[in-house]
Amino acid sequence: MQLFLLLCLVLLSPQGASLHRHHPREMKKRVEDLHVGATVAPSSRRDFTFDLYRALASAAPSQSIFFSPVSISMSLAMLSLGAGSSTKMQILEGLGLNLQKSSEKELHRGFQQLLQELNQPRDGFQLSLGNALFTDLVVDLQDTFVSAMKTLYLADTFPTNFRDSAGAMKQINDYVAKQTKGKIVDLLKNLDSNAVVIMVNYIFFKAKWETSFNHKGTQEQDFYVTSETVVRVPMMSREDQYHYLLDRNLSCRVVGVPYQGNATALFILPSEGKMQQVENGLSEKTLRKWLKMFKKRQLELYLPKFSIEGSYQLEKVLPSLGISNVFTSHADLSGISNHSNIQVSEMVHKAVVEVDESGTRAAAATGTIFTFRSARLNSQRLVFNRPFLMFIVDNNILFLGKVNRP
């Protein structure tokens, strides 16, 4: 019997603009509140988020990357509820949980609190995170597992007839489409005949920039994918005061562009040829340092409009982080079902990000070719015209990615 995990993610950002701005003290509070995995793994002894990023980057060094650390960590934590022996230990250690300093119960309570916080109604942007369990009628799930999924992870549960594969796919795809506001449709193209349980985790985020980019300032410019490959992209521009820093140790520049509400997009531009150096230096400590050292600076910011999608078979990636047992015939998932032959055969993760002047999908790049205007005195020009990194943070790292080719 096979257990499938589908992580269905969508990020739409930003849309529109507001008139208020972040005060420096608000950014300082974000640093103090930022969990960067602390909610996921109390007393963490490793950076799961950044280890996973490096594993994905290593597997496809020339491709763009986009994923949600919160969503993947939550899915693994849910799995650990039903895992036993070495299977559970691998998952918890892979997440970085030090069981000598914190309890497994703290992990699940942390996620319960995170779900409640992230799903609170907010002004200026939409953020929802949730889980669902689709179970075949022939499978007996452990009552304790179902109860924990409902109480700790607020999961919806649905009886599903997997023998009717077309009907099961429609049921699951319709649910995913509804939760992602129609952004992800037909997630399942086919369904394994041995499937008996499907766990779904989704996150939806749609935000407005605090100050939008002017469509009239968008212009076609060169983007240097490599020294040999140059593509034309619609480049947005806006002169304003931004949170900014130059990290000389990692040879990169970091700028924070706030959304309405409490979320911020961080864009990291490595110096030429220094992408791998920056990737190797990513850590919770590094991110905290960046946020703490931000200073307001007048910048003329040039940022490409882009849309990238990340789709990953995590059963092929997580073993490099020490999480392998759950994907084999040796898996102990006795806490999910009393069937001895149940294992996770597939763990699918899909994420989409769209960034433009206002977040409207229908907005198109202008066909007019402009030239860069001269920057004002005391205003520094920062042009993202080569591969860069992107974070979306809201007390936690919601999304992390690399834009290799917009």
UniProtKB/Swiss-Prot annotation:
The subcellular localization recorded is: Secreted, Extracellular space
Q: In which tissues is it expressed?
A: Predominantly expressed in the epithelium of seminal vesicles. Expressed in the proximal tubular epithelium of the kidney. Expressed in the superficial and more differentiated epidermal keratinocytes of the skin. Expressed in megakaryocytes and platelets. Expressed poorly in kidney tumor cells compared to non tumor kidney tissues. Expressed in spermatozoa. Present in very high concentration in seminal plasma. Present in high concentration in plasma, synovial and Graaf follicle fluids. Present in low concentration in breast milk and in amniotic fluids.
Record carries keyword Disulfide bond: no
Q: How is its activity regulated?
A: Its inhibitory activity is greatly enhanced in the presence of glycosaminoglycans, heparin, thrombomodulin and phospholipids vesicles.
Give a single Pfam family match: Serpin
Annotated phenotype, changing residue 381 to E: Does not inhibit thrombomodulin-enhanced rate of thrombin inhibition in presence of heparin
Summarizing the annotation, the consequence of altering residue 373 to P is:
Increases inhibition of thrombin activity. Inhibits heterodimer formation with TMPRSS11E
In the UniProt annotation, what is the result of changing residue 105 to E?
In allele PCI*B
This entry's Gene Ontology molecular function terms read: acrosin binding; glycosaminoglycan binding; heparin binding; phosphatidylcholine binding; protease binding; retinoic acid binding; serine-type endopeptidase inhibitor activity
Provide the leader sequence positions: 1-19
Annotated phenotype, changing residue 360 to R? Inhibits heterodimer formation with TMPRSS11E
Please give the function described in this protein's UniProt entry. Heparin-dependent serine protease inhibitor acting in body fluids and secretions. Inactivates serine proteases by binding irreversibly to their serine activation site. Involved in the regulation of intravascular and extravascular proteolytic activities. Plays hemostatic roles in the blood plasma. Acts as a procoagulant and pro-inflammatory factor by inhibiting the anticoagulant activated protein C factor as well as the generation of activated protein C factor by the thrombin/thrombomodulin complex.
Q: What is known of its domains?
A: The reactive center loop (RCL) extends out from the body of the protein and directs binding to the target protease. The protease cleaves the serpin at the reactive site within the RCL, establishing a covalent linkage between the carboxyl group of the serpin reactive site and the serine hydroxyl of the protease. The resulting inactive serpin-protease complex is highly stable.
Q: What is this protein called?
A: Plasma serine protease inhibitor
Q: Which organism is it from?
A: Homo sapiens
Source lineage: Eukaryota, Metazoa, Chordata, Craniata, Vertebrata
